[in-house]
Each structure stands twice: as C-alpha cells, then as structure tokens.
C-alpha cells in the first residue's frame, strides 16, 4: 500500500538552487492519495470536540475544507492581508526578507470554540504562529495543528510547541 510520501513529488532547485521543493499538488490530484492524507490527518482527533477547522492560505484551504466536511464542522480561512471582505483582525509575522500579514474575519471564531489549524507544510512556523495568535485573540482554543509535511530542520515544530501547541504531521523531510 502506498504512503502519503509516495504521492508527494520532489522538485529539485525550486524556487531557488539548493531547495528540494515538496509538491503536494500530486497528492491532491490523486483520489486515493488525497483520501489517505485526509483520513490520516483526521485520525488523531477521533472523539475530540472540534468546533471549527481553520485553513492557512492557500493549500490549507484544500485540506481544511475537506477535513471540516468530514467532521461536519465549519471552515474558516486565514488569508493574506487585503483578501477578506468585511471586518478583519490582522497579525504580522517575519519572513526571511521582510514581513507578511495574515487576517481573519473578526466574527469567524467565537470565544471558547475549539479549533484545529490545518496547512500542507510546516517550515519555520511563522504563518501558523500568526494564525494561532489571531484565533486566540478571538477567544478560540487551539486543539492542535495538523500538517502533511514537517521540515524539522527549519524549526517550526519547536516554535509551535514552545507556544504550548500540539503539532501533528504525516511525514517529515530533513534538510531544505
């Protein structure tokens, strides 16, 4: 039987020389691979109360939507600044060369709601940390984070765990 990693394509020297880009679009395109990934991402949360699933832009929308559907729960997107209509709150985070800002609708999470945060890849953890801060500012409680891929050498897992947040990933790749 194939594993999730069997469906992930590696592209050498993309987007820069020396980078091994882990492309999950091949996983999404395969119905069996996609089903395996969603089922495995759901497994740790069987029996837990989850009120909302939050997906981080952009591939977190694909995963989060599928997971929310399976759980019969609402889905909430966290988007780049300026992409959500209506009233939002924002959180800045640092990139390698500069800063980025993500936003969430100010009424998307109600105080006390239990939230699962989903994305395809955990690298430095900056986007996930910013998203978690937004959810917590709205009064949400982070149940866990779930990723397809963890790049442990980039420190994202340690960063989120230092915040007291549980991290689950289906697979890990060493290096960049």
Swiss-Prot record:
Gene name of the encoded protein: apt
Protein name, UniProt field: Adenine phosphoribosyltransferase
GO MF annotations in UniProt: adenine phosphoribosyltransferase activity
Main subcellular location: cytoplasm
Disulfide bond entries: none
Subunit structure: Homodimer.
Domain of life from the UniProt record: Bacteria
EC numbers on record: 2.4.2.7
Gene Ontology biological-process annotations: adenine salvage; AMP salvage; purine ribonucleoside salvage
GO cellular component assignments: cytoplasm
Record flagged with keyword Protease: no
């Amino acid at each position: 039987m194939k594993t999730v990693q069997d469906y992930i394509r590696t592209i050498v020297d993309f987007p820069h020389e020396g980078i091994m880009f882990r492309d999950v679009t091949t996983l999404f395109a395969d119905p069996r691979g996609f089903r395996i990934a969603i089922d495995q991402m759901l497994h740790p949360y069987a029996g837990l109360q989850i009120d909302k699933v939050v997906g981080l832009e952009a591939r977190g929308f694909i995963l989060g939507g599928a997971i929310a559907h399976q759980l019969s729960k609402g889905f909430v997107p966290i988007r780049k600044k300026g992409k959500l209509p209506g009233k939002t709150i924002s959180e800045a985070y640092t990139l390698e060369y500069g800063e980025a800002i993500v936003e969430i609708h100010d009424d998307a999470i109600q105080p006390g709601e239990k939230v699962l945060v989903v994305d395809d890849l955990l690298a430095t953890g900056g986007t996930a940390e910013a998203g978690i801060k937004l959810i917590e500012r709205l009064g949400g409680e982070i149940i866990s984070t779930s990723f397809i891929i963890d790049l442990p050498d980039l420190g994202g897992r340690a960063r989120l765990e230092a915040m007291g947040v549980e991290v689950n990933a289906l697979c890990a790749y060493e290096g960049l």
